Amino acid sequence: FYSAGDTILGADDKAGIAELIEALEVVNEQDILHGPIEVVVTIAEEIGLVGAKHFDYSMVQARYGYALDTEGVEMMVLQAPGANHIQIELEGLASHAGMVPERGVSAIQTASLAISQMRLGRIDYETTANIGVIEGGVARNIVPQKVSMVGEARSHDPVKLQEQTEHMLSCFEAAADEMTREIDGKRVRPEIHVEVRPDFPSISVDEKAPVVTLARNAAVALGQDLKIRLGGGGSDANIFNGHGIEMIILATGMTGLHTHDESVAVADMLHVTELLVEIIR
C-alpha cells in the first residue's frame, strides 16, 4: 500500500489495527486455544496520546501487553523517552517600526535571540529538543509585542530531561535580560510566561521481562529474529507503562510514516500478523 503522493497513507497506525483484527480472526477461525485477551484501541494518539491519557485503566486486567506502533519489521522497542511540553509567551512593547522603533521592545527578536542560544535537535544519544511552533506579530510596521511558542524536550533519562528543560527556559531569561531597554525613564524588560507540563513518561522494560520473553519465543517459533531498537517517539505504550501495565512496542511494517512516501507491504503485514497469532497461542 502506498499513499497517493499528496498526503500520508495512514499506515500509522491503521496497519497495526488491521494486523490485530486479522490476528484475532485467525485465532477465532482456527479455534486456537488461548488465555484472556484484552484489546484497547485508543483515539487521538497523534495529537498528544489523548485517548490513552483519558482511558479508564480499571477496565483492564492485563499486567503486560503490546502496542503495534513502530516502523520496520521484526523490531521491538523496550525503551522510549519521556517528554515535557513547553509553552512560552513573550510580551514586549509595541511601537511604530518606522517612526519610533526605539520605543518598542520586539518579542520576536527576543524569541529569536533565545532560540539562537538553545541546544536543539539531537542533544545526545538519548535526548532531543525542539521548538515546533512560533507565532507572533500583527503587521509589518509594528514592533511585535507578543510571540508564542510551543516546544518540547525528550530524554530517556529523567535528569537529562529536567536539565534540558531548564536550559531552554534559561535561554529565554537571558534573552529577556539582553533585550531590556530604558524607555521614557522606565526599565522595560520583556515578560516571560511559561507553562511546562509532563507530556508522557519514559519506557524502560527489562530484556528479561515476561512480555519480552513471550514475544521472542513466538518469533523463534516462526523463524523470526526480533531485534531491539531504541525508541525516540511517544506512543500509547508510554502512558500504559505509566499506569503500571508493562508494554513494549512491536513493529508493524510501515515505513516513511508522517510523510507522502508512507507505505506498508502486505507481506510485512502478514509477517506481523503471524507473530501476533503466535504470541496469543
Spell out what each predicted region is.
Residues 1-7, 91-95, 222-223, 254-258:
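Glycine/charged-rich beta-loop-alpha catalytic/anionic-binding loops adjacent to active sites
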Residues 2-81, 123, 140-141, 152:
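Acidic/histidine-rich catalytic neighborhood of metal-dependent amide-processing enzymes
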Residues 38-40, 85-89, 148-152, 193:
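Beta-strand secondary-structure signal
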Residues 42, 69, 89-93, 154-156, ...:
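Solvent-exposed residues in well-ordered beta-strands and their adjoining turns
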Residues 47-48, 92-99, 149, 196-201:
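Active-site-proximal beta-alpha loop/turn segments in soluble metabolic enzymes
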Residues 107-281:
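Metal-dependent amide/peptide-bond hydrolase catalytic core
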